[in-house]
Amino acid sequence: MATMLEGRCQTQPRSSPSGREASLWSSGFGMKLEAVTPFLGKYRPFVGRCCQTCTPKSWESLFHRSITDLGFCNVILVKEENTRFRGWLVRRLCYFLWSLEQHIPPCQDVPQKIMESTGVQNLLSGRVPGGTGEGQVPDLVKKEVQRILGHIQAPPRPFLVRLFSWALLRFLNCLFLNVQLHKGQMKMVQKAAQAGLPLVLLSTHKTLLDGILLPFMLLSQGLGVLRVAWDSRACSPALRALLRKLGGLFLPPEASLSLDSSEGLLARAVVQAVIEQLLVSGQPLLIFLEEPPGALGPRLSALGQAWVGFVVQAVQVGIVPDALLVPVAVTYDLVPDAPCDIDHASAPLGLWTGALAVLRSLWSRWGCSHRICSRVHLAQPFSLQEYIVSARSCWGGRQTLEQLLQPIVLGQCTAVPDTEKEQEWTPITGPLLALKEEDQLLVRRLSCHVLSASVGSSAVMSTAIMATLLLFKHQKLLGEFSWLTEEILLRGFDVGFSGQLRSLLQHSLSLLRAHVALLRIRQGDLLVVPQPGPGLTHLAQLSAELLPVFLSEAVGACAVRGLLAGRVPPQGPWELQGILLLSQNELYRQILLLMHLLPQDLLLLKPCQSSYCYCQEVLDRLIQCGLLVAEETPGSRPACDTGRQRLSRKLLWKPSGDFTDSDSDDFGEADGRYFRLSQQSHCPDFFLFLCRLLSPLLKAFAQAAAFLRQGQLPDTELGYTEQLFQFLQATAQEEGIFECADPKLAISAVWTFRDLGVLQQTPSPAGPRLHLSPTFASLDNQEKLEQFIRQFICS
């Protein structure tokens, strides 16, 4: 795999002395400086608008057109102007003076307010089932409440917060080149906070540094001390004690006990009282909606859903009239110290371990000019009360993946059921089980909705673009980088960089230095070669950040590939594939099949969006990007002829959430629509590029289907996942498909096959065990499953 960094493509040997390669990194590329024209002087999209379907009032009232014109600020850049003083001494002590000037509101009488809260008092007086009643000694109960409260939080220490902010500011300036924040997004959040409603930030989770960087950012912007809901499993006791004094919150282990446990009832009542007190006092709260980095599990965090449940319950009972939810995301060029060891990813971070990691980061960056960049994204706030009242879902009847896909995989039927997929990988913990069933569903849909908004508002960094080009485009990095940047902006996503093209490429390649090799083949020409093995796996993980931008087109391209799989040879020319007519019904069916196969954690469909609405969106995207062209069949009314259309009676009474084809009022007319693949010169390469974006996941699924013949079953879920991961690694060594050798892809394949009915789970004394279902015990059905998956893969 070779990629040219210059305009001409050459084929030369890849070998080069290591000393000569090292000189390439140190001496620069020696190429002509060129300005980035695609996004300088063009409209930069303002991303992060809230859902107009679920929260229309917030969409209009909590947004101001003027804020889109504001620029960016570097939140870790503190100068003399950021303090009240001036002079040469201030310029040397500006970090320290800035930390002293930060306003930290005091927290007084918190334990007494918690004890006097309605929930705790009702529990102590025996007014709720499981209450202690009059039989217990009040002093012992108060001590138990204080013990639970001490596990949850501690009053923030102003001196410690200021000292930590000063040290963190110095550390961030050594680690990061800049931490960019859109001034318009910050202004939007500040204006929303002026209404007096509490802010609840719901964030993605790239690294443990997110929980430190976001509070520092909000403190520097004058929004006070951010209370962070941490995961107890990710921190040691000593680190938890430090984080509590800095404003951290931890869920007590008793809160996950059974519903009839008195200890669990008391712990949940205390946590609920703590959340209510935070919301009443107006302190901002940060909740992570994703699992901690390195955790092998579902993307949506069960702990994050539990914290969201407490906030929803506080608003529903009227403790606070409303709360403003702010989707947040933090993106990095490279995630600092991302855990990559499957055996040690779940180990808690200790205080001394964290200190050594900080020192190691500082030592590695000492004298290094290539520091990483970061971007903080604050999406448009929206009203939680409005979402509770007006949130709607297109889910009517739901079916499991086994009911939807298994008959089609086995060839027993061809029609796709007109229903949504039910797939919930995130376990429901004790705090969420304590809510009503409809409230549990509300919390799950809200969490999925906000996580989708956070991912959609994330900017694409230069390293993600570079990794994608190195994996899936093999021509000219300079030209393709500009093209891909423009395609991202045209789709309403933002990029986390700007500057000159040569500098951007040099910056990203320097950060990816451990995974690529630079070879000079002639004067002015440079060859970029990805390192085989783990380097390709790392590049595939980086390129996955680009998938949300092109996800609709990628799903559509793979669906078209599946539709053409049985008609033309896989290696057939593009002109031969463009001759075939593709009906709209066939396209809908293939898109639905692929949608059901792909995990919900990847698609992140909003609950207010139906599958058929998404199918229409995918088809529209394929037409807009020029891959599909409408074909007028003889005797049919042209698609552009809207003058003779008449309103159908059934359209007049459709639900407002039912978004169907706007060009046709009768489904019978839509059935007759046909499309062809476009014959434009750029279409074959772009079609292949879109298909390859989903190829790591689909190839992992196909290899998991082939592994059914070799897997040792029955086994535990973790044991079988480890078996599959070792098989993916062995296959990668043989075939060179290293982008599939990812433990997250392995566990995603195992869970998908479990939902599909390929694997069945049975209880045992040692825990649940997986075994092969009788239906897929035959080699014939296993081959049908593998062929069903491989039809969507473009070789």
Curated annotation (Swiss-Prot):
<keyword id="KW-0812">Transmembrane</keyword>
<dbReference type="GO" id="GO:0005739">
    <property type="term" value="C:mitochondrion"/>
</dbReference>
<dbReference type="GO" id="GO:0016024">
    <property type="term" value="P:CDP-diacylglycerol biosynthetic process"/>
</dbReference>
<comment type="subunit">
    <text>Interacts with PIWIL2.</text>
</comment>
<comment type="function">
    <text>Transfers an acyl-group from acyl-ACP to the sn-1 position of glycerol-3-phosphate producing a lysophosphatidic acid (LPA), an essential step for the triacylglycerol (TAG) and glycerophospholipids. In vitro also transfers an acyl-group from acyl-ACP to the LPA producing a phosphatidic acid (PA). Prefers arachidonoyl-CoA as the acyl donor. Required for primary processing step during piRNA biosynthesis. Molecular mechanisms by which it promotes piRNA biosynthesis are unclear and do not involve its acyltransferase activity.</text>
</comment>
<feature type="compositionally biased region" description="Polar residues">
    <location>
        <begin position="9"/>
        <end position="18"/>
    </location>
</feature>
<keyword id="KW-0496">Mitochondrion</keyword>
<protein>
    <recommendedName>
        <fullName>Glycerol-3-phosphate acyltransferase 2, mitochondrial</fullName>
        <ecNumber>2.3.1.15</ecNumber>
        <ecNumber>2.3.1.51</ecNumber>
    </recommendedName>
</protein>
<dbReference type="InterPro" id="IPR041728">
    <property type="entry name" value="GPAT/DHAPAT_LPLAT"/>
</dbReference>
<feature type="topological domain" description="Mitochondrial intermembrane">
    <location>
        <begin position="333"/>
        <end position="449"/>
    </location>
</feature>
<feature type="modified residue" description="Phosphoserine">
    <location>
        <position position="656"/>
    </location>
</feature>
<keyword id="KW-0444">Lipid biosynthesis</keyword>
<feature type="modified residue" description="Phosphoserine">
    <location>
        <position position="662"/>
    </location>
</feature>
<dbReference type="InterPro" id="IPR022284">
    <property type="entry name" value="GPAT/DHAPAT"/>
</dbReference>
<keyword id="KW-1133">Transmembrane helix</keyword>
<dbReference type="GO" id="GO:0005741">
    <property type="term" value="C:mitochondrial outer membrane"/>
</dbReference>
<comment type="similarity">
    <text>Belongs to the GPAT/DAPAT family.</text>
</comment>
<keyword id="KW-0012">Acyltransferase</keyword>
<dbReference type="InterPro" id="IPR002123">
    <property type="entry name" value="Plipid/glycerol_acylTrfase"/>
</dbReference>
<feature type="transmembrane region" description="Helical">
    <location>
        <begin position="450"/>
        <end position="472"/>
    </location>
</feature>
<feature type="region of interest" description="Acyltransferase">
    <location>
        <begin position="180"/>
        <end position="331"/>
    </location>
</feature>
<keyword id="KW-0808">Transferase</keyword>
<keyword id="KW-1208">Phospholipid metabolism</keyword>
<keyword id="KW-0472">Membrane</keyword>
<dbReference type="InterPro" id="IPR045520">
    <property type="entry name" value="GPAT/DHAPAT_C"/>
</dbReference>
<dbReference type="GO" id="GO:0006650">
    <property type="term" value="P:glycerophospholipid metabolic process"/>
</dbReference>
<dbReference type="Pfam" id="PF19277">
    <property type="entry name" value="GPAT_C"/>
</dbReference>
<feature type="modified residue" description="Phosphothreonine">
    <location>
        <position position="660"/>
    </location>
</feature>
<dbReference type="GO" id="GO:0003841">
    <property type="term" value="F:1-acylglycerol-3-phosphate O-acyltransferase activity"/>
</dbReference>
<keyword id="KW-0594">Phospholipid biosynthesis</keyword>
<dbReference type="GO" id="GO:0006654">
    <property type="term" value="P:phosphatidic acid biosynthetic process"/>
</dbReference>
<keyword id="KW-0443">Lipid metabolism</keyword>
<keyword id="KW-1000">Mitochondrion outer membrane</keyword>
<dbReference type="GO" id="GO:0019432">
    <property type="term" value="P:triglyceride biosynthetic process"/>
</dbReference>
<keyword id="KW-0597">Phosphoprotein</keyword>
<dbReference type="GO" id="GO:0004366">
    <property type="term" value="F:glycerol-3-phosphate O-acyltransferase activity"/>
</dbReference>
<feature type="topological domain" description="Cytoplasmic">
    <location>
        <begin position="473"/>
        <end position="795"/>
    </location>
</feature>
<feature type="topological domain" description="Cytoplasmic">
    <location>
        <begin position="1"/>
        <end position="305"/>
    </location>
</feature>
<dbReference type="GO" id="GO:0006072">
    <property type="term" value="P:glycerol-3-phosphate metabolic process"/>
</dbReference>
<feature type="modified residue" description="Phosphoserine">
    <location>
        <position position="664"/>
    </location>
</feature>
<feature type="short sequence motif" description="HXXXXD motif">
    <location>
        <begin position="205"/>
        <end position="210"/>
    </location>
</feature>
<feature type="transmembrane region" description="Helical">
    <location>
        <begin position="306"/>
        <end position="332"/>
    </location>
</feature>
